[in-house]
Amino acid sequence: ESAISEIMKKIIREQESKIITPIDDKMFFSLLIFYSLQLFRTKKMMSKALEKIEGFILNRGDEEIVLDDSQKKTLLKCMLYITSFQFALRIEKECFAIKIYKNHTKINYITSDSPAIFYNDDSVAAMPLSPRLFVQFSLNKKIKEILPARIGFETIDIYNTEKIKRINKLIHDFSDDFLFAKKNVDLNFDF
């Protein structure tokens, strides 16, 4: 995770600069992994998984060991971590376009305790990267179709506060319990 964090910091630094820097394959996959980790390693996802799983039992020969709640949570965190990488590999095959929205308004992008957004019949994956950057992956759910050899990359400059408010409203709608903003004005969703 620390390696992914370093790559994410580099991506954010480069994308926030005035010079347009295309995302290379390593950065692309790091973005997908970061997105997937943010999607699967949330309190809500943990709770959903714990609701569905009554218990874990380890078998060693004839011996059965029932995991306690603490051990169950630790094992589940590992499972969700692995699932995150599997999901990143899946959406890597489906992704045909990446858009990075650069915010040039006085309102910042907000984030939440569940920042990864998956919507529009699971054809769009999106997430705020910083108060000034928002990433969107367009996915092709028809895996049988041939995808382009190279993923389309586009940087979109946003100067309209209404667009930022709409994105922030979307982030709000997909949040679990908490929203995080730099300023109170960032939490105003009036259009």
Please report, for each region that a protein language model flagged, where it lies by residue.
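Alpha-helical structural context detector biased toward long hydrophobic helices
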Residues: E1-F191
